[in-house]
């Protein structure tokens, strides 16, 4: 049976105002433009979100993933994915982003696809405990997660990851370095436009921004503690914007405590990309306070929020970790000791006292992102990996070959 097309499957909500959805769209569109038809399969049962406008080469198939917990949701999604796949022709490539959709495909790889691409942005054996602390002591679940990850790592013909730290960890888990490609995240420079830092105004509170997941692995608690320290000396408002799970909302509100009553903290739901960019421009400093933990230092990551902040021109204070150093020099971002609210507060004060330093960081950060991290560069790297490592012919090459044959 002849193989046809690419299936890009992801156990992620799409569309959504999250980094994962931005990443999925960028990669699916690039694959469609380069190689022809792409079937994009993702979680699409969010109420009130319109179907995204995608290129003609990408067909979106939203699937449900309802369930009382993550395991139930994953099993529901797998069942829907299996039903969707029934009777479909064999794929040329299947591209997955996690074990939740990837494991059953890896098990049946020989009958489903010519090639399997496993894009590793994170691994549940490391990340799950931060979202669901009760699973940390479930040894049986952890064993299953590691086993399924290993099956996907071994079955993949191409492994893609956005971080060299992650690549090193995957090799330590037995991944073949010859099949591994590091492709950092990108930024839409037309959405995250540049503006120089805001000029200070007498009487206006200093406005800090934290964007992203409200979890300990991202360091939101360090941002709150730094806000408390700064309030001793000057008026401050810290804006927290991003997804907030129900069971973590209460803990976060407790952590905010008096800061909410004082009006020193505001909580915002996730914003569309254009509004998030405008919010950056309305703030004085962006905080990326990643802690030194196994998710950030062992598994690794490529924090999209850091790249987006650098693109906007608002000065950034970020943890001095390898995953940050890979994206930003100390002339582009003010890097501070991880896990230290005091270091964050002192860096913010330094920017306030030395606006010329903030302006220099701002311009250098934007220049770095324009040079190294436009989405086009990541898309080109992915297309090259498909062509060079998997031998997939570009659509233009196929049409030229067909035209020559018929001439």
Task: List each model region and its residues.
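Nucleotide-activated donor-binding/catalytic signature segment of Leloir-type glycosyltransferases, i.e.
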Residues: 242, 250-277
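Acidic anion/phosphate-binding donor-loop and adjacent secondary structure
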Residues: 171, 187-204, 219
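Acidic donor-binding loop of glycosyltransferase active sites
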Residues: 157, 280-299, 314
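Conserved donor-binding/catalytic core segment of Leloir-type glycosyltransferases
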Residues: 7-9, 200-228, 239
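Conserved acidic donor-binding segment of nucleotide-sugar-dependent glycosyltransferases
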Residues: 306, 330-341, 350-356
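Carbohydrate-associated surface elements
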Residues: 165, 186
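Membrane-proximal helix-turn-helix segments that form the acceptor-binding/catalytic region
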Residues: 81-86, 103, 107, 118, ...
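Glycosyltransferase donor-sugar binding loop
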Residues: 44-46, 237-253
């Amino acid at each position: 049976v002849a193989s046809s097309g690419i299936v890009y499957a992801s156990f992620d909500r799409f569309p959504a105002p999250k980094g994962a959805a931005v990443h999925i769209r960028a990669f699916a569109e690039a694959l469609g433009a380069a190689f022809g038809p792409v079937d994009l399969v993702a979680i699409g049962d969010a109420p009130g979100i319109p179907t995204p406008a995608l290129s003609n080469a990408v067909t979106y198939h939203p699937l449900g993933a309802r369930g009382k917990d993550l395991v139930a949701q994953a099993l529901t999604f797998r069942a829907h994915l299996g039903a969707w796949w029934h009777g479909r022709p064999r794929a040329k490539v299947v591209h997955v982003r996690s074990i939740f959709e990837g494991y059953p495909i890896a098990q049946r790889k020989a009958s489903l696809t010519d090639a399997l691409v496993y894009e590793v942005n994170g691994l549940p054996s490391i990340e799950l405990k931060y979202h669901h602390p009760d699973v940390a002591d479930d040894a049986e679940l952890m064993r299953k997660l590691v086993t399924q990850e290993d099956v996907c790592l071994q079955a993949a013909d191409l492994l893609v990851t956005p971080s060299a730290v992650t690549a090193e960890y995957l090799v330590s888990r037995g991944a073949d370095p010859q099949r591994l490609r590091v492709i950092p995240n990108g930024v839409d420079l037309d959405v995250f436009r540049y503006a120089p830092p805001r000029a200070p105004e007498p009487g206006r509170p200093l406005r800090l921004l934290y964007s992203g997941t409200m979890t300990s692995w991202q360091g939101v608690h360090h941002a709150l503690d730094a806000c408390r320290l700064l309030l001793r000396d000057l008026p401050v408002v810290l804006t927290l914007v991003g997804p907030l799970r129900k069971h973590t909302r209460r803990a976060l509100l407790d952590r905010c405590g008096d800061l909410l009553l004082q009006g020193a903290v505001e909580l915002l739901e996730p914003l569309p990309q254009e509004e998030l960019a405008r919010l950056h421009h309305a703030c004085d400093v962006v905080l990326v306070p990643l802690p030194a933990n196994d998710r950030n230092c062992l598994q690794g990551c490529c924090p999209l929020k850091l790249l987006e902040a650098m693109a906007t021109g608002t000065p950034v204070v970020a943890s001095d970790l390898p995953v940050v150093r890979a994206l930003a020099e100390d002339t582009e971002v003010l890097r501070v000791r991880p896990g230290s609210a005091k270091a964050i507060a002192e860096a913010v004060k330094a920017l306030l006292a030395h606006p010329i330093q903030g302006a220099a960081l701002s311009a250098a950060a934007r220049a770095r992102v324009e040079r190294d991290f436009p989405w086009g560069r990541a898309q080109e790297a992915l297309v090259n990996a498909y062509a060079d490592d998997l031998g997939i012919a570009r659509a233009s090459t196929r049409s030229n070959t067909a035209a020559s044959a018929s001439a």
